[in-house]
Structure formats: structure tokens, C-alpha cells
């Protein structure tokens, strides 16, 4: 049962009690109760004789008891209201308040059975895009589709609208305040790097002094660099990216291996740079795009578990072992009281059968099966069995409609079409709006 449901039930019980106890809700007031009758004013009772000398005394006693009864009723009323406030208001805060403190939601929050934030539709919204890629120094040239000559901007004007709840609109200054002193870490492949770039550009729109944002090592953004960290010095937080396309550790060539084996992937060993991740306040993982034959078997890379070379292991089976290794590391290393962990599901591409890339002008009316992914299902299964809470950013289905959002031929190399990566601004901005909702749906203390 959600907090909202429990709160509503409590309200009904409280109001039911008030209907009995409060003079406003009852035609028979406290003065007609047995206690009130016994100590009623002598004027209201016929004693069959003349008033006794103690009449004034009885009047005083009657008046005193009436006052006490009224006072008791009022106190009870206030206690009930106070209890209802303490119980209900925090729940309402979670249900109706977006991370910017505005009344944004008309239904349940993420995680409640009444609302799946990933079940919805794309709707046109002229408030988008959230930033200009040409004005953000952290967008790779290859992802700036408008800057690379894309002739229309309709693909920028779409917002994700869940069917039964609302994603809060991005309020940059509120988010900057909430991130003060934090460390946000993305770990994964180039899709993770794209989301990292998107978040930085979104956050920079709230700063007048853009020079206060810089890469901590003075590095330019490249595809192969293992670490990139951008510091927002005026708010004392960093947004970091660690390149770990498989999450597990690449292995060296074994001398006794068959000739076709050029390298291995150690499925039971997490990437050696994992010690850099564990102290983050927010950890966002992904892996999937490299788990294909072209990145593995066709390059001579095969799987290894312990000292055993698994030449016959399928890619899905290996992916599952790697996820279990990641999950064990999370459970043994990450402090859930400090670190919030999230895992983003597989991002669908929109290549045709002949590996041609036809980027559409508008979102596709149908997912054509791209809303399903064996990798995404494995992620959900593994996370479900973990002892530490992990949130899933289930972007697979919602992104499957966005055949209009890919880089296509509008990259830094127009000779190579790209229906895997996403334009910036674009779809990754929506992922980040949902990410921020997951992180900050609790009211600020």
C-alpha cells in the first residue's frame, strides 16, 4: 500500500471520529449527554419546590463541567488534527510535490502500483529543447545534430507524458541547490557518456558564470578517455563519467588459447577502476551496446570465468554473469545510506535490416518490437533479487518510439550513418528529467 493510500485511510478514520465528537458535526451536543444532564442548570429541571440555598453553587458546578467537556472536545479535536497532519503531510509531499516544490502531480509517484512513469506517450511541447548544444562546451561535436546541418528541429519538441502521473518540469536552480556538495557518477558506454553530457548542459543553463564549470583535468571529451569529471565550482559538486563498456574486466590473451582468441572478458571480475565509484552520492550504470558479436567474437574476444575460457558461452548468458558480478559488488561495497544506485536499461537503436539508417522526422507510431530487450529483462531480474535497493531507469520502451532522435548523418563524420547514438539536445535530456525525479522526489529538508 502506498503512503498516499495509507494517508487517505487515516484521514477517513480521523474525520469519522470528528463527526462523532465535534459539536459542528452532531445535532446533539455535549450538553445532552448523561454527564451534561446530571449537572444541568437548576432552571432546566423541576425539583417540585422552591430553590434551595445551594442553587448558585450547583449552577457554578454545572457551568464548570460544561466548560471542561467543551475544552476536552476541543483538545481531542486538535490532537486528531495534529496527528493527521504529521501522518498525512509527508506522504502528500511525496505524492503531490515535484522536486521543485510545485504542485505537479495528480496521481501517484514513481514506484506506486497506480503509476508506471515509463508507461506513457510522447507529446509536443514548445518549451523544449532545454539548452542550445552550440552554447554548451561539453557536447561532443558528433552529437550536435543541428550544428552539423540537420535542417529541422521538430525532433527537439517532444516531452514524455506518463499516463497516470507527471514528470516534473526541469527547474535548474532548484536542482543545482539540491546537488550542492554531491558527487554524481555515470559508469558505462558511450550512451552513458551522452547522458552525462546532457545533464551537464542542462545544469549549466542555471549559471551566469559558465567559467565556473570545468573538466577537472583540463581534458577534452573524447570517445576513448576512461575518466571525465566536470566540476560546478559555485555549487561544489561534480558530474563524472567512467568509461566501462562491459562493467567487467578485460583479460589478457592466454598463451594456450586457440588462435581465434585474441582477448578475454573476465565475467566474474568487475572493472579494475571500480574503486573510483563507490564513494559517489549517485551512481548511474549502463551496459549493452557492446554486447554484440561485432564487438566480441568478431574481434577475437571471448568469455572467461575464473581460469576457465568459455568458448561456447552465448552473449546473453555472459551478460547475465556480468550483471551478477556487478550486483555482488554493489551489495558488498556500496553503502546504501550514502549512495543511491540506479541502472539504466538498454537503449534501442533504429537500424534497418540492411544496416541502413533512416532517421524519421517524427517519432514512430509503433515500436516494431524495439520496446523489448533481453538485456533489459535481465537487468530487472537481477536487480529484483538484490539486497540493496537499486532503481531502474527503464528507458527501453519509451525510447523505442524515437526513430527521429538519432544522429543519422548529422555527425562529425557524415560518411558514417549512426542510428544508435542520440542527438543533443534530445532523448537523453528526457532520461535525465526522469533521473532527477528519481533522485529528488523527496521534499527538501
Curated annotation (Swiss-Prot):
GO molecular function: O-acetyltransferase activity
Pfam family, any one: PC-Esterase
InterPro entries found in the cross-reference section: TBL, TBL_C, TBL_N
Motif (DCXHWCLPGXXDXWN motif): 418-432
Localisation per UniProt entry: Membrane
Membrane topology: Single-pass type II membrane protein
Entry keywords, A to Z: Membrane, Signal-anchor, Transmembrane, Transmembrane helix
Transmembrane segments: 69-89
Signal peptide span: none
Gene Ontology CC annotation, any one: membrane
Motif annotated as GDS motif, chain positions: 188-190
Family, as annotated: Belongs to the PC-esterase family. TBL subfamily.
Described purpose of this protein according to its UniProt entry: May act as a bridging protein that binds pectin and other cell wall polysaccharides. Probably involved in maintaining esterification of pectins. May be involved in the specific O-acetylation of cell wall polymers.
Entries under PANTHER family matching the protein: PROTEIN TRICHOME BEREFRINGENCE-LIKE 7, PROTEIN TRICHOME BIREFRINGENCE-LIKE 9-RELATED
Further details from the record: Contains 2 motifs that are conserved in esterases, but it is unlikely that this protein belongs to the catalytically active pectin esterases.
Protein name (database record): Protein trichome berefringence-like 7
Organism for this UniProt entry: Arabidopsis thaliana
Amino acid at each position: 500500500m502506498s503512503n498516499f493510500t495509507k494517508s487517505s485511510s487515516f484521514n477517513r478514520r480521523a474525520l469519522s471520529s470528528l463527526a462523532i465528537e465535534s459539536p459542528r458535526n452532531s445535532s446533539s451536543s455535549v450538553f445532552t449527554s448523561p454527564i451534561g444532564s446530571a449537572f444541568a442548570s437548576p432552571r432546566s429541571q423541576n425539583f417540585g419546590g422552591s430553590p434551595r440555598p445551594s442553587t448558585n453553587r450547583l449552577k457554578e458546578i454545572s457551568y464548570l463541567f460544561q466548560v471542561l467537556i467543551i475544552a476536552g472536545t476541543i483538545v481531542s479535536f486538535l490532537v486528531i488534527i495534529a496527528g493527521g497532519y504529521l501522518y498525512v503531510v509527508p506522504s502528500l509531499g511525496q505524492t503531490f510535490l515535484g522536486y521543485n516544490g510545485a504542485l505537479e502531480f495528480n496521481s501517484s509517484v514513481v514506484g506506486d502500483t497506480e503509476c508506471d512513469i515509463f508507461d506513457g506517450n510522447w507529446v509536443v511541447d514548445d518549451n523544449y529543447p532545454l539548452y542550445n548544444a552550440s552554447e554548451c562546451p561539453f557536447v561532443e561535436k558528433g552529437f550536435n545534430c543541428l550544428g552539423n546541418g540537420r535542417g529541422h528541429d521538430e525532433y527537439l519538441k517532444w516531452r514524455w507524458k506518463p499516463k497516470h502521473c507527471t514528470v516534473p518540469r526541469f527547474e535548474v536552480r532548484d536542482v543545482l541547490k539540491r546537488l550542492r556538495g554531491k558527487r554524481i557518477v555515470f559508469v558505462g558506454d558511450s550512451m552513458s557518456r551522452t547522458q552525462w553530457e546532457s545533464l551537464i548542459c542542462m545544469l549549466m543553463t542555471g549559471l551566469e558564470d559558465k567559467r565556473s564549470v570545468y573538466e577537472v583535468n583540463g581534458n577534452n571529451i573524447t570517445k576513448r578517455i576512461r575518466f571525465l569529471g566536470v566540476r560546478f565550482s559555485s555549487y561544489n559538486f561534480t558530474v563524472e563519467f567512467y568509461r566501462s563498456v562491459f562493467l567487467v574486466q578485460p583479460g589478457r590473451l592466454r598463451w594456450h588459447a586457440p588462435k581465434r582468441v585474441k582477448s578475454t572478458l573476465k565475467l566474474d571480475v568487475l572493472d579494475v577502476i571500480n574503486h573510483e565509484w563507490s564513494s559517489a552520492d549517485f551512481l548511474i550504470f549502463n551496459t549493452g551496446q557492446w554486447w554484440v558479436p561485432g564487438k566480441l567474437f568478431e574481434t577475437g574476444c571471448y568469455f572467461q570465468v575464473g581460469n576457465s575460457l568459455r568458448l561456447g558461452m552465448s552473449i546473453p548468458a555472459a551478460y547475465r554473469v556480468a550483471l551478477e558480478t556487478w550486483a555482488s559488488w554493489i551489495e558488498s561495497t556500496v553503502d546504501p545510506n550514502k549512495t543511491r544506485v540506479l541502472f539504466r536499461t538498454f537503449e534501442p537503436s533504429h537500424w534497418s535490416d540492411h544496416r541502413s539508417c533512416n532517421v524519421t522526422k517524427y517519432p514512430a507510431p509503433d515500436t516494431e518490437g524495439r520496446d523489448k530487450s533481453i538485456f533489459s529483462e535481465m537487468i530487472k531480474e537481477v536487480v529484483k533479487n538484490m539486497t540493496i535497493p537499486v532503481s531502474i531507469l527503464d528507458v527501453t520502451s519509451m525510447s523505442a518510439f524515437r526513430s527521429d532522435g538519432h544522429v543519422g548523418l548529422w555527425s562529425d563524420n557524415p560518411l558514417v550513418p549512426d542510428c544508435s547514438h542520440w542527438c543533443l539536445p534530445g532523448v537523453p535530456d528526457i532520461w535525465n528529467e526522469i533521473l532527477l525525479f528519481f533522485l529528488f522526489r523527496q521534499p527538501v529538508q
